[in-house]
């Protein structure tokens, strides 16, 4: 069974502040990246399965957040947005005035070639609950 993983990471990186984008692009293990946290006034952080990495020595500014929000577009009522034709999810944290004060950018990945393991169950047409780590 051959698996391929598609993450379209470049599409997610394209909406990030330049210094954050460059830090991630230069990492050898960027394929393992789980999420990027951009909180106002704090250092940007990349989260990997076994570690967390500071992505810049400059704290996230209002301009950084506004730029990302502008490139992403509209957030839903649940304060989430996506990037077209990808599985990436961006969650916004807002203050009481409704201003975005933080963004968590979750890397979405499609794993192709794995359905063979459960094809017979899927083809039964019944409900299935699949659990896994977030």
Which residue ranges define each predicted feature?
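N-terminal accessory targeting/assembly segments
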Residues: 1-82, 86
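P-loop NTP-binding catalytic core
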Residues: 56, 67-132
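Short, ordered loop/turn segments at secondary-structure junctions
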Residues: 41, 133-134
